[in-house]
Amino acid sequence: MSTEKTSQASKEYQLKEADVKKMLVATTHLGVRNIDRRMQFYIFDRQKDGTFVFNLQKVWAKIVFAARILVTIDDPAEIAVVANRPDAQRAILKFCKYTHATAFPGRFIPGNFTNRMNPNYCEPRLLLVNDPVVDRQAILEASYVNIPTISLCNSDANLKFIDVAIPCNNKTPMSIGLIYWLLAREVLRLKGSISRTEEWDVKPDLFVALPEEIPDEEESEDFYDDDEEEDEEFSAGNGNLFDEY
């Protein structure tokens, strides 16, 4: 009986075909032409042009692992989510909207985690960043005060001070949006907020920033602080970006 329950539970966490198709459409599986030796474990193949290809099973496994870490934080507001890259700002704000984490879109102000005189000073229990290169300042400060760090990592990422790496294409809007959507969905599933057997009614399109929508740094938070009606209008106006080709 226990073996059957274990087998059933493991099937629930398996990567579904529908999610694989979404990842392929969003080019989540494509890295860059350079590679860090510690990222080789996540590589499936290499294209003729030199682009490394991620193993999607390993990508999914790290998404589930990261989600299980995120749900251990009793107060989600103590999770800091940082993204300096404009293409990722809508994604992290939507992620924080549904998981109640704290977003730091735009330039990360030095001293947010280490300088008590900083008006934005905070002491998060966990850090989630979009890019270990662009968001290096946040990672360094987290290492100074022993904050565990989860990061989306491309094939050339430096994993210094990164505790959990989610291998993926973290440079294009569709891939970034999809990863945060998958992560938010898994967090809500683990918390029991949504069913694992039913489709989440929030579409991944809502996490994707289109080029003409990328705001100025100081306007980013207000720009993306929209309600459900505006979300529906955005989705209807742009169709389903993750339709199969």
Swiss-Prot record:
GO-annotated biological processes: ribosomal small subunit assembly; translation
Coiled coil: none
PROSITE patterns: RIBOSOMAL_S2_1 (PS00962), RIBOSOMAL_S2_2 (PS00963)
GO molecular function, one term: structural constituent of ribosome
Domain of life: Eukaryota
Main subcellular localisation: cytoplasm
Keyword Ubl conjugation: no
Residue segments, region Disordered: 211-245
Subunit structure: Component of the small ribosomal subunit. Mature ribosomes consist of a small (40S) and a large (60S) subunit. The 40S subunit contains about 33 different proteins and 1 molecule of RNA (18S). The 60S subunit contains about 49 different proteins and 3 molecules of RNA (25S, 5.8S and 5S). Interacts with ribosomal protein S21.
Membership in a protein family: Belongs to the universal ribosomal protein uS2 family.
Compartment annotation: Cytoplasm
Residue ranges with Acidic residues bias: 213-234
InterPro entries in the cross-refs: Ribosomal_uS2 (IPR001865), Ribosomal_uS2_CS (IPR018130), Ribosomal_uS2_euk (IPR027498), Ribosomal_uS2_euk/arc (IPR005707), Ribosomal_uS2_flav_dom_sf (IPR023591)
GO cellular component: cytosolic small ribosomal subunit
Gene3D superfamilies: Glucose-6-phosphate isomerase like protein, domain 1
Protein name, UniProt field: Small ribosomal subunit protein uS2
Function: Required for the assembly and/or stability of the 40S ribosomal subunit. Required for the processing of the 20S rRNA-precursor to mature 18S rRNA in a late step of the maturation of 40S ribosomal subunits.
Keywords: Cytoplasm, Ribonucleoprotein, Ribosomal protein
Ribonucleoprotein listed as a keyword: yes
